């Protein structure tokens, strides 16, 4: 990439690039509210976690069982991000073994119609997969 630069310049270039990316990202949030929402709920696992919490409170192991392909590390990271973003509430009781539950916050529950609209869009715009999605919509929790 920087073939003729001294080694110290690689680090400076990486820092500059990272700060530019962060600045551009923050400008995108200001310019578009949808970008802000997608940053909070986007990605591969967050929508699945939110969907699984729509019916109500779940313990950590219940969540893990309902999303069998997610790793422990990723589930923990995603739960922390959702909690930090105010979309879910983590409650723990100081007992052995640990008793930890997760539930959607008021802000998280407000995403239900958004998630439903996204699921409906997928049914109508995903070709053959739409039939499978349509069957899954029957499991979509009511308000």
Residue ranges and their predicted role:
Residues 1-41:
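N-terminal leader segment of winged-helix/HTH proteins
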Residues 91, 130-131:
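Short, hydrophobic secondary-structure boundary micro-motifs
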Residues 28-74, 101, 132:
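N-terminal helix-turn-helix DNA-binding core of bacterial DNA-binding proteins
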Residues 94-117:
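Basic, amphipathic "hinge/linker" alpha-helix immediately C-terminal to the N-terminal HTH DNA-binding motif
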Residues 131-143:
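Exposed, interaction-prone assembly regions rather than primary DNA-binding/catalytic cores
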Residues 57, 64-97:
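Canonical helix-turn-helix DNA-binding module
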Residues 47, 85, 114-129:
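Alpha-helical linker/hinge and terminal dimerization helices associated
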């Amino acid at each position: 990439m920087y073939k003729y630069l001294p080694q110290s310049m690689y680090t400076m270039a990486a820092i500059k690039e990272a700060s530019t990316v962060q600045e551009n990202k923050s400008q995108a949030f200001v310019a578009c509210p949808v970008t802000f929402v997608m940053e909070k709920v986007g990605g591969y696992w967050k929508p699945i976690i939110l969907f699984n919490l729509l019916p109500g409170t779940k313990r950590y192991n219940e969540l893990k069982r309902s999303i069998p392909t997610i790793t422990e590390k990723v589930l923990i990271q995603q739960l922390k991000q959702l909690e930090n973003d105010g979309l879910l509430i983590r409650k723990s009781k100081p007992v052995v073994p640990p008793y930890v539950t997760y539930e959607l916050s008021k802000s998280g529950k407000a995403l239900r119609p958004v998630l439903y609209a996204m699921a409906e869009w997928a049914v109508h715009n995903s070709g053959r997969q739409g039939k499978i999605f349509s069957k899954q919509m029957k499991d979509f929790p009511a308000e």
